[in-house]
């Protein structure tokens, strides 16, 4: 089932126009790409809010219907109110279904509850929560699953260890030397003992006290 969002062409621009739109439960947006001129449009705030409640909308090809004409797009950028978390502006990118696109896809970490090392107190460190990919729009995954259930103490998963769907490429691994760009995504690490942390903290405090005393002596000597 395709996801659809309706819009109207917008002629009014500027802060005043945007305020008037929002008073009427509308928000400004723009659609651009595929060599066509950018187009200012208006969205219904309730409709776009409902659409964004579906996580797949962020990584899906959407049917944008502007003045009853349909275009294939993806969401390229979102702006939200800093306090109310309400969407205030949307950028849509037109796409050609036969040409590859570059966009970010979230990583979903699974198997934490079945990981033996974590049951014994190991710590899960997630270094990356999304990854930039290149693929045809029809091959775009909604998310990439990362299974950590069998990850043992000291082990990690990097870009090359991800289970990437057919037709999808991680863009970082296309830039020359793979090892240089092969980032760690997640790792299982041994928790530091409380005594070790307390000892390190004590050393830091002692060093600070020594520096403070030396500074006081220098002041008195001068």
From Swiss-Prot:
A Gene Ontology term for the protein's cellular component: cytosolic large ribosomal subunit
What organism does the UniProt record list as the source?
Ruthia magnifica subsp. Calyptogena magnifica
SUPFAM superfamilies, A to Z: Ribosomal protein L25-like
Membrane spanning segments where? none
One GO MF term attached to the UniProt entry: 5S rRNA binding
Task: List the PANTHER family.
Answer: RIBOSOMAL PROTEIN L25/GLN-TRNA SYNTHETASE, ANTI-CODON-BINDING DOMAIN-CONTAINING PROTEIN, RIBOSOMAL PROTEIN L25_GLN-TRNA SYNTHETASE, ANTI-CODON-BINDING DOMAIN-CONTAINING PROTEIN
* Family annotation (CDD domains): Ribosomal_L25_TL5_CTC
Q: Which cysteines are joined by disulfide bonds?
A: none
- Keyword terms: Ribonucleoprotein, Ribosomal protein, RNA-binding, rRNA-binding
Concerning NCBIfam families, the annotation shows:
bL25_bact_ctc, PRK05618.1-5, PRK05943.1
Function field: This is one of the proteins that binds to the 5S RNA in the ribosome where it forms part of the central protuberance.
Chain segments annotated as coiled-coil in the UniProt record? none
Q: What binding partners and quaternary form does the record give?
A: Part of the 50S ribosomal subunit; part of the 5S rRNA/L5/L18/L25 subcomplex. Contacts the 5S rRNA. Binds to the 5S rRNA independently of L5 and L18.
- Protein family according to the UniProt entry: Belongs to the bacterial ribosomal protein bL25 family. CTC subfamily.
What Pfam families does the database record attribute to this sequence?
A: Ribosomal_L25p, Ribosomal_TL5_C
Name of the molecule in the record: Large ribosomal subunit protein bL25
A GO BP entry: translation
Xref: Gene3D superfamilies:
Ribosomal protein L25, beta domain, Ribosomal Protein L25, Chain P
Which InterPro entries does this one have?
A: Rbsml_bL25/Gln-tRNA_synth_N, Ribosomal_bL25/Gln-tRNA_synth, Ribosomal_bL25_b-dom, Ribosomal_bL25_C, Ribosomal_bL25_long, Ribosomal_bL25_short, Ribosomal_L25_dom, Ribosomal_uL5_bac-type
